[in-house]
Amino acid sequence: MLNVQLKIFCHAALIFLEVVYLFEPNLIYGVKKREKKSRSDSINHIIIKIKNGDIELKEKFIKKYKPYLLKIISSTLGRYVDPEVSEEYSVGLMAFNEAIDGFNPEINGNFTNYCNMVVNHRIIDYIRKNKKYSNVIPFSYFEERNDFEEKYLVSDSHYLYENIEVKEEILQFEQQLKQFGITLEDLVMNSPKHKDSRELCISIARILSENDKLFEKMIRKKCIPLSELMGLVNVHRKTVERNRKFIIAVSLILRSGLDEIKQFFRASEERREK
């Protein structure tokens, strides 16, 4: 049985693969790209505009950074968080607003680091006040230790060994992607944005992964065998072409040893069939 740390790591990878992560703020909010400005500078600039009263920008910022917030919450809790029904998400969202309102670039420096600290702090406070979480070990323990972690968390070294094994599997998956000319960054930018589209692509990837002949041809040619695949799926050819990278990535996962991620894709298909 996979331990808590393994599940957390896989869920974090899952969130990454779902396309929901940090987007380039210059593209989202219309802030002109300045030369020699880092991403953190751009985010800080957005926060300053929000603090100066730009309500619409704040709403856009919260909406677009929802995936990042979910990643923090999920990592801290050690499981996937459903924003529609999760009390923890509400706690995290309030903490995210708190981070925006309380951020001072001259004091706090980088917003994402500051936000991570505030949200982690609030989620851990929530865990401490709820007995149902008494046995949960926050994922932040498995990252680099800092003063915050030393203050709140307790060591349990046997997780570290299995963490290494999972990281090796993830790295192997990343190397497989590179053989197809795909990077993890490509998945962030090119994966389907809508839930229905993602679930459709997952079902296509499963058909591809379960057909040994097609899958082996894909591995050999380093591309989707479109002509053969189109005879097995009832979708437009352009749908497959447009989501090629995501479909390849999911099919590789489904043929991998990443059982927790595979379980998520199975659940996605079951929801789609209902």
Swiss-Prot record:
Lineage, uppermost ranks: Bacteria, Bacillati, Bacillota, Clostridia, Eubacteriales
Motif, Polymerase core binding: chain positions: 87-100
Family: Belongs to the sigma-70 factor family. SigI subfamily.
Activity: how regulated: Negatively regulated by the anti-sigma-I factor RsgI4. Binding of the polysaccharide substrate to RsgI4 may lead to the release and activation of SigI4.
Gene3D superfamilies the record matches: 1.10.1740.10
UniProt keyword terms in alphabetical order: Cytoplasm, DNA-binding, Sigma factor, Transcription, Transcription regulation
Gene Ontology cellular component annotations, sorted alphabetically: cytoplasm
Feature: DNA-binding region: 226-245
GO biological process, one term: DNA-templated transcription initiation
The protein's name in its UniProt record: RNA polymerase sigma factor SigI4
Induction data: Up-regulated in the presence of cellulose and further up-regulated in the presence of both cellulose and xylan. Up-regulated in pretreated yellow poplar (PYP)-grown cells.
SUPFAM superfamilies: Sigma2 domain of RNA polymerase sigma factors (SSF88946)
Oligomeric form and interacting partners: Interacts with RsgI4.
Gene Ontology molecular functions: DNA binding; sigma factor activity
Role, per record: Sigma factors are initiation factors that promote the attachment of RNA polymerase to specific initiation sites and are then released. This sigma factor is involved in regulation of cellulosomal genes via an external polysaccharide-sensing mechanism.
Gene that this polypeptide is encoded by: sigI4
Localization per record: Cytoplasm
